Amino acid sequence: MALGWAIIGAGMHPHLKLAPAIGLTPDAELIAVLSRDQGRADAFAETHGAKAGYSKMDDLLADSRIDAVFVASPNSAHVGHTVQAAKAGKHVLSEKPMATSVDDALAMVQTCKANGVKLGLGFELRFHPAHLLAKDLVSLGKLGRIRLLQGHWGRGERGEPEHLPRSGLRGWWEDPETMGGGSVIMGLGVHVFDLV
C-alpha cells in the first residue's frame, strides 16, 4: 500500500521538486496540498494529480488518506505545522531549516516523539553522488586528517539562467520575520553546514 503524502505549501519548490519527486517514488502517492488560497491549492492538486487541495490545516489533517506531510511552508511556520501534524498522527518531513529557534526545534522533536510519529528534515544534498563519495573518502581516511572545510554554493547550470523569472510579487523569503531571521545562512548556508 502506498504512503499517502500531503504537501504543506504550494510554492515554486513544492511545484518543481517535491510533488514530482513524490510522483516518481514507488509506494508513495500525493494525496493533498495545502495553500492559504483555495484556488491555488486546487490548481496545484490538479497539476500534480493529487486527490485534494485544502486551504485549512484542520481539513487536511482530517483526511485519513494522508500518512505523512512534507512541510514546505515559510520557515516561521514550520513549528506550528509540524506540531499540528504530529498531534494528528501524521509523520513529518520538514523543509530546512528545521525551525527558527532551538525551543521551536525541541518542541517539534518532543511532539513527534510523544505522538509516535517520525520527524525528518529535507536535506536532499546529502544524497548527491559527489557528496556521498566525499563522505566515504573522509570516513576511510583517504584524505588524511581534515583541518579545514570550505563550502561554496552555486546556483543554476552553465548556459541556464540562475533563477526562474520573477512574478514581481514579494516572496516570503524576502521578509525577515517570515523567514525567521538568519538571511542567507537559513536559506542556503544551512545546506553547507549540514554537509559538513
Q: What positions do the PLM features span?
A:
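Predominantly a Rossmann-like dinucleotide-binding segment in NAD(P)-dependent oxidoreductases
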Residues: 128-196
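A broad helix-preferring feature
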Residues: 8-18, 61-69, 115-117
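Hydrophobic residues in well-ordered beta-strands that form the structural core
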Residues: 14, 54, 93-94, 119-121, ...
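Short strand-turn motif at the edge of the Rossmann-like AdoMet-binding core
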Residues: 96-97, 123-125, 153
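Beta-loop-alpha module in the N-terminal Rossmann-like domain of NAD(P)-dependent dehydrogenases
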Residues: 51-111
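Rossmann-fold dehydrogenase core element
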Residues: 107-125, 145-149
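N-terminal Rossmann-like dinucleotide-binding module
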Residues: 1-48
